[in-house]
UniProtKB/Swiss-Prot annotation:
The keyword Transferase does not apply. The lineage of its organism: Bacteria, Bacillati, Bacillota, Bacilli, Bacillales. It comes from Brevibacillus brevis (strain 47 / JCM 6285 / NBRC 100599). This is Large ribosomal subunit protein bL31. It holds the Pfam family Ribosomal_L31. Its cofactor is Zn(2+). Signal peptide: none annotated. One of its GO terms (biological process) is translation. Belongs to the bacterial ribosomal protein bL31 family. Type A subfamily. Part of the 50S ribosomal subunit. Keywords: Metal-binding, Ribonucleoprotein, Ribosomal protein, RNA-binding, rRNA-binding, Zinc. The gene is rpmE.
């Protein structure tokens, strides 16, 4: 196998737009993300369930059933 062909794997600080920072591993020097597990609705429990409704629901609304 060839020596020294792989990029250096660093421990980097990942910073989120919400202000949360944590360490991870990457070949980059620093990472910036827009959303993390600290502010994502799935992890915070502030999910909104959107039910678009199907064809049957539209039919019932159209004919007041």
């Amino acid at each position: 196998m060839k020596q020294d062909i792989h990029p250096k794997y660093n421990v980097v600080t990942v910073s989120c737009a919400c202000g949360n920072e944590f360490e991870s591993g990457s070949v980059k020097q620093a990472l910036k993300v827009e959303i993390c597990s600290n502010c994502h609705p799935f992890f915070t429990g502030k999910q909104k369930f959107v039910d678009a409704g199907g064809r049957v629901d539209r039919f019932k609304r159209k004919y007041n059933l």
